[in-house]
């Protein structure tokens, strides 16, 4: 893993990052899914390696879920904070 990568959940509102890795081994232990299931779901909604993400908003309770703009076409998705932990991004300055 590159040292400058952060989980998506660590970005600030308005901050952008490039997806560099999706690693289910980083999934919190309280999330029970079959191996590969969460990664498949994330890929299906368009979060793939090398796509740009922008954090748009955090939910009111525990900053959960996180609203994220995916790519440059304006697609917005919401993802649970604990699931966003497996999406490793390289922050864009």
Where are these regions (language model features)?
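Compact, charge-rich alpha-helical regulatory domains located at protein termini
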Residues: 1-48, 54-60, 64-93
């Amino acid at each position: 893993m590159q040292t400058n990568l952060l989980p998506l959940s660590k970005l600030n509102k308005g901050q952008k990052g490039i997806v560099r890795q999706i690693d289910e081994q980083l999934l919190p232990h309280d999330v029970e899914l079959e191996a590969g299931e969460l990664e498949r779901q994330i890929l299906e909604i368009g979060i793939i390696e090398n796509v740009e993400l922008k954090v748009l908003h955090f939910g009111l309770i525990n900053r959960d879920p996180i609203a994220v703009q995916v790519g440059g076409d304006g697609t917005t998705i919401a993802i649970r904070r604990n699931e966003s932990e497996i999406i490793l991004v390289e922050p864009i300055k």
